[in-house]
Amino acid sequence: PECDSLNLAQWEDYPVGNILFEDKVPESQGSKIYKRIIDNPQNYIKEQAHTVLATLYNSKQDSIAPVYNLHYTLENVEGVSAKGGENGNIYIYYSTQHIERSFANNDTTKLFFETRGVLLHELTHAYQLEPQGIGDYMSSEVFRAFIEGMADAVRAANNGFTPSDRPKGGSY
């Protein structure tokens, strides 16, 4: 379910880890566009991390995957975004090429919606628990289905998708 303001309020002081924002391509159009919609990346990432935590967990006493360091980068790469790292040291990149594609019609609202949705998805990977005893992300479709399904569910629960955003059929 979507996190409500009461549940979200209990997470405001929860430590989400040391957030390091790095723009690896400040000269790119995608970077310039990003900076127009997100003026304080560290605070924005922290706010969205609290939303993810409030959606994934009932309380701060739950068994929560710790995040000590979160290195978030803007990079000139194909694709959209990805999370890597382990043991509380997490990195997430966001593609400036994707930012440019998402802003193709100069629609700031659409871009902000997409940027938030992508961030909710990737932050879910940072804070979610992983299934045990069924392999890993690369070797198990069941593992991937759990991980990606949960991230999409958190995004959807927080109004991060429109009905037309998800292709029908296929496998993810």
Regions found by a protein language model. Name each.
Residues 77-80, 98-101, 126, 133-134, ...:
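Solvent-exposed loop/turn segments at secondary-structure junctions
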Residues 131, 138-171:
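Post-HExxH zinc-binding segment in Zn-dependent metallohydrolases
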Residues 117-130, 148-152:
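Active-site recognition of the HExxH zinc-binding catalytic motif
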Residues 98-119, 134-143:
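Short pre-active-site segment immediately N-terminal to the catalytic Zn-binding motif
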Residues 32-97:
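Auxiliary, metal-adjacent structural segments of Zn-dependent hydrolase domains
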Residues 12-39:
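Acidic/histidine-rich, surface-exposed loop or edge segments in extracytoplasmic proteins
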Residues 1-2, 9, 171-172:
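Pan-zinc metallopeptidase signature
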